[in-house]
Amino acid sequence: MSTIENFDAHTPMMQQYLKLKAQHPEILLFYRMGDFYELFYDDAKRASQLLDISLTKRGASAGEPIPMAGIPYHAVENYLAKLVNQGESVAICEQIGDPATSKGPVERKVVRIVTPGTISDEALLQERQDNLLAAIWQDSKGFGYATLDISSGRFRLSEPADRETMAAELQRTNPAELLYAEDFAEMSLIEGRRGLRRRPLWEFEIDTARQQLNLQFGTRDLVGFGVENAPRGLCAAGCLLQYAKDTQRTTLPHIRSITMERQQDSIIMDAATRRNLEITQNLAGGAENTLASVLDCTVTPMGSRMLKRWLHMPVRDTRVLLERQQTIGALQDFTAELQPVLRQVGDLERILARLALRTARPRDLARMRHAFQQLPELRAQLENVDSAPVQALREKMGEFAELRDLLERAIIDTPPVLVRDGGVIATGYNEELDEWRALADGATDYLERLEVRERERTGLDTLKVGFNAVHGYYIQISRGQSHLAPINYMRRQTLKNAERYIIPELKEYEDKVLTSKGKALALEKQLYEELFDLLLPHLEALQQSASALAELDVLVNLAERAYTLNYTCPTFIDKPGIRITEGRHPVVEQVLNEPFIANPLNLSPQRRMLIITGPNMGGKSTYMRQTALIALMAYIGSYVPAQKVEIGPIDRIFTRVGAADDLASGRSTFMVEMTETANILHNATEYSLVLMDEIGRGTSTYDGLSLAWACAENLANKIKALTLFATHYFELTQLPEKMEGVANVHLDALEHGDTIAFMHSVQDGAASKSYGLAVAALAGVPKEVIKRARQKLRELESISPNAAATQVDGTQMSLLSVPEETSPAVEALENLDPDSLTPRQALEWIYRLKSLV
């Protein structure tokens, strides 16, 4: 890019551009030029690649052609959305001076900075997902982490103690933009994330952070927020708040408090668990066939976002959970009436954020009015619900009759997109505005009267009075009659077949009309800004109302799901344990074309580990995951897919289910598996729910079996966690005989000829057969390979003389038995082809074999 070194050689306009660009060197600068935003030099080259737009040249400056790319101002939101989705930030530079009075370039300034984590515009946001700005800080004692949803004002901080917990927080929150200090040591935690922003160290200083936060909240200290003793979290929060203020170029009145998130308040799930349980994102990265896809039939975007937050942070406070359960039960008879009305409320939460930022558009205010219009009916319907929590929500949502009346009087029914287009303020709201509009709108009548009068006065039947945007008002006479034009007609424009004229009276009226239009638009903008001033004093109450409406939407949705999907209300018990009668997988049962086979589960301190065996495809992983999902659903207060559930305290959910190579970090499948296993063994407690699926794959058979055995022993004897341990190592089925609290269960299958039918039914005891070859045949492995595999299996089974004693049906050899040396007689028989022997040779072979025994 052209530099400041040859600054004086540039044109005045480019000097202005370069000054503004120097203030924002690392982000794209959209420089307003008439009806376009233009980008120059390196910005133009980057934008042409990112947006797939043409790269051209705009004249020359300092003797060099200027690379240039441009986008129409009316389409800017679409282009901003593309850039934000790619993690880019953009400074929007507008003309603020009057071209008519400017000497030199029109005055311009950057009015806002659009970044992935600070957007609030409707067109740039995913309506059913939170969009978070985050900051991360680290010192010798651990991490500090803060998140802000600028589109709602929700401000949170936490202090993850270690790397694994920090990784889980990043996975849970998935920020659109992440600020980090220039000396941040754990770059491998955040590398590859979108929207990374390196910030100077001084922005994370604790004293600056306290000062920033107290100034924002109007407080002398932070004790009332419960964050005073969270220095690492405050360092992150201070940097984050300063960045938000810098980018928004305005106050942030909707950010009124900050909340500390503590590990002990919610069930902890690490990054692997969130991924494996497919809570809001499936393993392929999509949203289909996830828990959220089944549970989320909310009717407002803000309700959908709240439900997803609940799913990722199950609460441990049973008082909160029992209140939600009671509310869901009370609402089940009212869902059909409430959901259509709630649907009309829309995304009040984000509209209020735009109001606070003074970026709300006319249609935002119209939607706010529409939301207010639903409140009387909602409150009337809720009055009939016999539930104290529901009545508390009813009071919290308010009614706002005065604000509804204000917006009904002030804003027309269907306003334009932008206030600068005019026609936003309703007739009758302001007398002066009505007068200016009457003058501007009366032009049509005046022109018709003038045309009739001038035709009669001149006798010219081709005379017409009209208007265009370039030349203004005119009197047009055909070429054939133009020589008869009166002497007071002054020629304004010559056309091929006509002449256009102006007269003093029409010129005077034109000035008056154009002045009235300008004054009407200026007054309309002023009145629109005054509406903000009238609404903003109610912002806190409005935010509480939006929160109550979102929570009501979530609870009504969960009530509808419970009724429609035949869920039951779980019971919380004081001791560790999970007892499920006829449990079902909430997602799998929705995608199956046949009835789902429900299964029981019983975990308690006396039966704390289940060794699960059975064939591949038999349903072991489904059974394990459904247990975790039922527990998760219970701990958000939801009803669950089962006939009956009793569930005790849970502090963490761990899953070691499936794995893939982590090529980016140079870790094999086995290394990933062992890392996840180590995390479980270090952090699980007797109150944890642990899912372990086929530990020990990816290494030698004996290594794998030994690791699986030791892990199972540790979980059952030392940690005493509630554990579901699926395995194909049949030796592990001996564990119940060797230690207390361990039991065998299995999923069975039936073979008929070359076909296999999976029963998907959980039974007590160990499986008797692995069915591996049958599953391989089902998958389409060639018959000759299956045939050879059966032959090899018989050979392997014959190696151990103890195999028959270990496995009655002879289908699985004991891996812990020591193979004996093969008998020479057996070896000779294996190499013998009976069909090729003559009677004499056969007799000789009998004597030879006799000598070998």
UniProtKB/Swiss-Prot annotation:
One Pfam family hit: MutS_III
GO molecular function: ATP binding; ATP-dependent DNA damage sensor activity; damaged DNA binding; mismatched DNA binding
Keyword DNA damage: yes
SMART domains on file: MUTSac, MUTSd
PROSITE patterns: DNA_MISMATCH_REPAIR_2
Keywords noted in UniProt: ATP-binding, DNA damage, DNA repair, DNA-binding, Nucleotide-binding
Any GO BP: mismatch repair
InterPro entries: DNA_mismatch_repair_MutS, DNA_mismatch_repair_MutS-lik_N, DNA_mismatch_repair_MutS/MSH, DNA_mismatch_repair_MutS_C, DNA_mismatch_repair_MutS_clamp, DNA_mismatch_repair_MutS_core, DNA_mismatch_repair_MutS_N, DNA_mismatch_repair_MutS_sf
Similarity remark: Belongs to the DNA mismatch repair MutS family.
UniProt-recorded name of the protein: DNA mismatch repair protein MutS
Gene name tied to this protein: mutS
